[in-house]
Structures are given as C-alpha cells and as structure tokens.
Amino acid sequence: FYSTTFGNLFSSKKVKYNSKNHVENLSIFLNEKIKMINFNPNKLPKNLISEAKKLLPKSNYIGFSITQGNEYRKKSWSIYKFISLANKSLIKNKTPVFFIEKNQEHIIDKIKNQVPGALFPETKSEMPCPALVTALSSRLDHAVSIDNGVMHMISLADIPMIVLFGPTNSEKFAPKNNHVKILDSKKIYKTKNIGSITVDDVYNLI
C-alpha cells in the first residue's frame, strides 16, 4: 500500500523519497519503472464517439469545466471570470463549450444569458457519463479547467489544457501529459486564493 499521508505513515513499505513526483516515488516503491501511456480516445465505445460528433460537429471549440465536486476546499474560479474568458475566446473564433450537469440550471442560465452561442452538450444527450466527457473533449481545440474530476476526464483526450490551481497541490493532482499548462496561484502570486489568477493570465495561454 502506497500513501504519502503523514510522512508515509500508512505505506506498507518504508522508503525514503527525494522527489515530490508521485510517479517517480511509486516507481521506487514498486522497484519497477512506471511508463506513462496516453489514452487513445478512439478506443472509446463507437456510440459515444458518434454522440460526441453529433453534439460537436464542427471545429474551433474551447471547453470549460468550472464546478468543483467537493466544497471543503475553495478550488473554484469565479464564474464571472469564466464568462469573461469565454467571451474573449469568441474573438479568436472559438465556440465556448461548458461541461456542466443538467441539475446546475442556475449556472447554465447565467452563462447562456452572458455568453452568446455557448454550448452545453451534456444537457442535450441521453447518455451522459464520464466517457462521453472524454469523447466530447476529443472534439475540442483547447480546454480550461479547475482542479476537479472533469479535468481528469478531459485530460484523457490528450488535448491542450490550461488547469487552474489554488489551495490544492498542482504537482500532485495535475494531469500528467505534455499538453497541460498549469496556473498555480501559490507559485504565481504566493497565495492559495485561486481568485488571484486573472482572466488575462489564462487568455494569454490560449
């Protein structure tokens, strides 16, 4: 059992680690080199790939994942900053695509009222599931996300991503692929407040 909690107290094997990289540490723990393998979204079920193409049939899409699952840590970036970023992306001829569940009507309505042409594909599908999010993400040019579960679903599509971090550990939780750009408020502004990250900080990376 591998865990770094309380200085590796619960790990079944006591090993001294010199890195904060969990993949490197796990390789030492298992005494075996761990290889990074990118997921191929084309191996998803064909019905989900077809559904994604039906929902997002064109190109120049940019995705946004804005809601956090756990409320105990303030990981959310202001919805108004996401709205501003989505509207600025229209200047680059990008169509904003929001990954928001159907039960978040108040958020969806707020975005619809302020972002012309914004799409909410999950609300139009009868087969919403994590795999559909990955299939939809494969149709995107870029994606912007906070640290949440959808971030990992998007990252499986292996597309350019910008991920925003505040109180959580970007080195631990950020997707491990070559297309991810990280904006960590702790490293940029020396604060855990994710709100310190500006719209232009993100826009300049798109």
Language model features with spans:
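Catalytic machinery of carbohydrate-active enzymes
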Residues: 1-206
